[in-house]
A protein has these predicted regions:
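Interaction interfaces in information-processing and related assembly proteins
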Residues: 1-228
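Cys/His-clustered metal-coordination modules, chiefly Zn-binding fingers
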Residues: 196-292
Length: 292
């Protein structure tokens, strides 16, 4: 099953919903960053959320950034997404290993206590930025809390990544259910009742259920209406020219030191780990264009 996001409404527009399957996307991230199982699960959950939240944005140029910064061994997780289903991300310490907690990967322990920041760049003078504390550091609950506190939108977020025995991704995905301001009390009660039928996202995905079927469990008795589907993938738009800007940003003195060393340098993109080499001649050319 290729990765995709489903968008839907229910209860005559009182509810909007998103669901996604993201196995290939999360596996691509794992391959790019060579992440440990717990790092894959943490990054995969945030990537899945980023893909769905990105699809909420209206314009082609809109960009979303999600940052989780905790005091656990992972350090931090950064994800960016556009409105077209393209998402990328990285974790500060990809090789962290932790013992399981209650038979599951200990994402909360790996992330630790900290903050979630959501930045939306929608082409306005200033990007929108909202920040909340991590309530469980398991990602889904933290986003539920963020939506309620920072955006005043009562929501339910479910995210999951299941690893295979060979440490590749067996399945991944998630859902976001949001109440509109005019949602009736009985609609909310019905969704709360329906949520009892969802054990975990990965339980349903590993049985072969689709995002549409997961939404049907959650909203099928509330007039579920699928409005659109869109593909989603791990995609990094880095290039040698873009990474060059990072080299320029270190300043003339640092670049001159690199030239004096007489060695080629290698710079890696944070988001996809692609390495770009710059020869001494290229560094001299960069130095000429450096302002400071």
């Amino acid at each position: 099953m290729n990765d995709y996001i489903v968008r839907a409404t229910a209860a005559d527009g009182q509810v909007r919903a998103f669901a996604a399957t993201t196995k290939e996307l999360v596996e691509a991230a794992r391959e790019h960053h060579n992440t440990s199982p717990v790092a894959t699960a943490a990054l995969g959950r945030l990537l899945t959320a980023g893909a769905m939240m990105g699809s909420m944005m209206k314009n082609d140029t809109d960009m979303l950034t999600l940052q989780v910064r905790g005091d656990g061994p992972l350090g931090g997780i950064t994800v960016t997404a556009d409105s077209k289903g393209d998402v990328k991300g990285y974790v500060n310490h990809p090789d962290v290993m932790l013992p399981p907690k209650n038979g599951k990967l200990d994402v909360g322990g790996a992330v630790g206590i900290g903050l979630l920041q959501v930045i939306k760049d929608m082409g306005l003078k200033e990007p929108y930025s909202g920040q909340t504390i991590l309530v469980s550091s398991e990602i889904a609950e933290d986003l539920t809390y963020y939506f309620a506190v920072s955006e005043q939108v009562p929501s339910v977020v479910g995210l999951g990544v299941l690893m295979d025995k060979d440490n590749t991704v067996a399945c991944a995905g998630g859902f976001i259910i949001q109440m509109m301001p005019f949602a009736k009390e009985e609609t909310i009660s019905q969704i709360e009742e329906n949520l009892k039928n969802i054990t975990s996202v990965t339980d349903h995905l590993k049985k072969g259920e689709t995002p549409e079927q997961i939404l049907k469990i959650l909203l099928g008795n509330l007039g579920l209406e699928i409005t659109s589907t869109m593909p989603t993938k791990f995609y990094c738009n880095c290039s040698k020219e873009r990474v060059e800007k990072a080299v320029i940003s270190v300043g003339k003195k640092e670049i001159q030191d690199m030239i004096d060393d007489g060695q080629d340098i290698e710079v890696k993109c944070h988001f996809c780990n692609t390495a770009y080499k710059y020869s001494v001649e290229e560094l001299k050319d960069i130095l000429k264009r450096c302002k400071r």
